[in-house]
Amino acid sequence: MATIFFAEPELVIGHGRKVLFLNPGDLQIFKEIELPPDLTTCGLKTVEPVPAPGHPASSSKQQPAALKEATGSVKVEVSIQNVTYSPDRQLLALTTAGQKAVLLYKSRPENAQLLSIRPLARASSALRFCSDGSSVLVTDKTGDCYQYDCVEVDASPRLLLGHLSIVYDVLWSEDQQYIITCDRDDKIRVTNYPATFDIHSYCLGHKEFVSGLAMLTEQHIISASGDKTLRVWNYTCGKELLLHELPAPAVRMLVRQLEPEKTYEVAVLFYDYVDAIGVYRLEQTTTESWSITSTQLVRAEAGTWNICNFALTDDRIYVTGAENERLTLRVYDSRNGERASGLPEGWLKMVLDNLDVAAFMPEDLSVWFKKRFDNVSEYLERKKRRIEEQKQQKCG
């Protein structure tokens, strides 16, 4: 998986065992984090499996694959899954696959300093710091959401809530009263915090997976979905305020606040469409009224390579994807959608050489869509044939 995002003034790219920090103007690397091949060498603690009561201790041959991975008897390749900054940019959290862990770094002033490394139960799907950076939320692919303390950095995680399907994004309100999650089963859930056993509200209306969430105001969020819609909600009461039709399913969403206040730029990565990215201008007209005032579609040479992620700045769109099963990056002008000019010669080779990229296959996003089975039509067809056969027998 390749992750990329822009956090003023840095462009951050994570892939394999490295995180690169670039100046978005000249694309020069000024800092990097490299993980070791074995995370136990930097402090990841393993847990020995506990045999069932009355059962003899299992041999290594009898241990399930997951337990072999935890005890280190099977070597797995470490790869970065998600990366995010705290709001004040003082902390950076990242999660890994292979040896599943969440790592917390002090990111300032110069070189990143590892503060803690704690095991994850399952592969992560999203990361989000709280507003004061005192803890970070990690959601996983089975629907659970854990809280990791960033003050007591060695504290065990706390399970806060769970969904019945994979959680694709998570938000934490500025006042830390609500945790907002979205999942593959088209639901947006608003959960009270710290009493996370109490669900405050739902934002219902999407017909497919909800791939992204973003906070707009203290009471409003925007969501993107595989049902080809953008929607704005008052999440405190679960009320839909805007539904905007998209030309294709949305699999990634980024939101930037513009001037004047309550004006936003919303960028959406489409699934399998002739134009790869849609850029929309969103404005709040009254307290409970929103509108899309402009639309720009960016082709980004869709169809010639497999696009998987992107980052947005004031004037550029940075896109990652696969070409001939190799990771690559392309930069486009956000004003006209054309390839960006004025980039330093050799920048792409420099970045890819630093990432030491091997074969790269983006995630198969087709599995995000629900599988629908129509047993009724088949039943009715069989019933129709049976009735016709019975009529023929009577006539014969």
From Swiss-Prot:
What does the UniProt function comment say about this protein? Required for the Mettl1-dependent formation of N(7)-methylguanine at position 46 (m7G46) in tRNA. In the Mettl1-wuho methyltransferase complex, it is required to stabilize and induce conformational changes of the catalytic subunit. Required for binding of nanos mRNA and repression of translation by the mei-P26-bgcn-bam-sxl complex. May cooperate with mei-P26 and nanos to derepress the BMP signaling pathway. May cooperate with mei-P26 to suppress expression of a subset of microRNAs. May cooperate with mei-P26 to regulate bam expression levels in germline cells during gametogenesis.
- Keywords, comma-separated and alphabetical: Cytoplasm, Developmental protein, Differentiation, Nucleus, Oogenesis, Repeat, Spermatogenesis, tRNA processing, WD repeat
Q: Which organism is it from?
A: Drosophila pseudoobscura pseudoobscura
What name has this protein been given in UniProt?
tRNA (guanine-N(7)-)-methyltransferase non-catalytic subunit wuho
Q: In which pathway does it act?
A: tRNA modification; N(7)-methylguanine-tRNA biosynthesis
Assembly, per entry: Forms a heterodimer with the catalytic subunit Mettl1. Interacts with mei-P26 and weakly interacts with bgcn; required for the function or formation of the mei-P26-bgcn-bam-sxl complex. Interacts with nanos; may be involved in mei-P26-dependent derepression of the BMP signaling pathway. Interacts with Myc; the interaction may be mediated by mei-P26 and may be involved in the regulation of ribosome biogenesis.
Which residues, by range, are in coiled-coil regions? none
Q: According to its UniProt record, where is this protein located?
A: Nucleus; Cytoplasm
Instruction: State the SMART domains in the record.
Output: WD40
The taxonomy runs: Eukaryota, Metazoa, Ecdysozoa, Arthropoda, Hexapoda
Q: Which family does it belong to?
A: Belongs to the WD repeat TRM82 family.
* Miscellaneous section: Wuho means 'no progeny' in Chinese.
Tissue-specificity statement: In testis, it is present at high level in hub cells, a niche for germline stem cells of testis. Ubiquitously expressed in all testicular cells throughout spermatogenesis. Ubiquitously expressed in all germline and somatic cells of the ovary.
Asked whether the keyword Transferase is assigned, the reply is: no
Q: Which GO terms describe its cellular component?
A: cytosol; female germ cell nucleus; male germ cell nucleus; nucleus; tRNA methyltransferase complex
Question: Which GO BP terms sit in this record?
Answer: oogenesis; spermatogenesis; tRNA (guanine-N7)-methylation
- In terms of superkingdom, the source organism counts as Eukaryota
| WD repeat feature ranges | 75-115, 162-201, 205-243, 302-342
